[in-house]
Swiss-Prot record:
It catalyses: Hydrolysis of terminal (1->4)-linked alpha-D-glucose residues successively from non-reducing ends of the chains with release of beta-D-glucose. This is Glucoamylase amyD. Substrate binds at W136. Belongs to the glycosyl hydrolase 15 family. Keywords: Carbohydrate metabolism, Glycoprotein, Glycosidase, Hydrolase, Polysaccharide degradation, Secreted, Signal. Its main location: secreted. Residues 1-24 form the signal peptide. It comes from Rhizopus delemar (strain RA 99-880 / ATCC MYA-4621 / FGSC 9543 / NRRL 43880) (Mucormycosis agent). GO terms for cellular component: extracellular region; fungal-type vacuole.
Amino acid sequence: MFIGYLLLILAIFGFYYSIQQINGSSIFKKKNLLDDWISKQNTISFNSILKNINPSGTPRGFVAASLSTSYPDYFYTWTRDAALVVRVLSDLPETDDDVLKDYIDFQIHIQNTPTVCHCLGEPKFNPDGTGYTGSWGRPQNDGPAERAITFIKIANRLKNSAYVSQKIVPALEKDLDYILQVWEQPCFDLWEEVDGVHFYTLMAMQRALLDAFDFFNLSKYRSTAYRIQEKIERFWSSEENYIRVTHEVREGANKPSGLDVSVLMAANMFATTREGFFTPGSDKVLATAAAIEKSFSSIYPINKNLQPDLGVAIGRYPEDVYDGYGSSKGNPWFLTTAAYVELYYLAMKEWKQTGLQINAVNKPFFERFLPIDDHCIYYSPDSQQLKEIINLVSLEADKFLATIQYHQQRNGSMSEQYSRYDGYMQGARDLTWSHAAFISAIKAREGNSVAF
């Protein structure tokens, strides 16, 4: 045990020393510069989101995925994107309540709009509020679950008002009833490419039902949530030491690795520390994070010979072929890179509360920057060793932020993707979800998670 602690101390000393030598200035100065950028970017991202809500010619409450109308055309609203964006806005005191109410009103409208799939899992709607009728991956059943989560967040913010009881509750119950009906059925994933049973979708559903139990105190929601959790457990692959993204694939993109950053996004957004179920700091999620990062570090040219203060650029999944315009080779995304920032900081928050055990499952996560032997080691919440580990992991988390800063435009714009070859932005301009993901990551960095 003593030798393990000694190695840890030596590793930490060497880590700090090497960074200072390579960068030629202290890490603290770099942190101050990063903090200054974060403060400015937070404001830019907030305003960018508002700019994409109710743009000219659209109904109030319409949340555009992007203002880009060609190459690519993202001037639509997705149930998922809108819910996840407004979920973040509802957590910010500077958000006007009218913005949230407009979102609710528009969502109630599209709940009752005729659609091709004749269900609440219709993913995409036109700028005039009508359903999109073109060929698409339908249904996408994470959408109603994410909307229910956001409805409950808004209801809790607005307290016991007539608006909550008369407007939000009936619409919320409609989404919850839908989840109870369809949770066992395959559907398309959040990337709209694979028809099957998905870790992300099930995590969204179980979180919506757990929140609903807290809100309504009805046992049917909790009992179904626990049944969903039993199904989610099966996504863990002990042979591969990571969580596979999809089971029971019926059609769609080929993902032989089974790796997908949406697994980590699900942990960030839908896990609860109270339940302790696939949380960001849990062994299996950390192991999955390590496997995904390792994969992207090898397949993206911009991840070769990285500057020491930059983190690995993260995409959706290794086999991705969507380049933001068409099919070729997939790229890193801003929102997926931000997911790593959020994951790391949420994990650190857990360790501060419960302590940390390094074991055979999560070893791949920690062995990248710590000397790890084959023994399980537990660090208590108040131990100096854990504090030093957290310092190391926070430096690694901030490298992902530095990557976002490095590849965005100087004016704070963030598109959907940035090139795997040269890092320049491509795809839909100022993707609303990119900006929301950044704000959510910074909330986690500040210790004020949107999720929990």
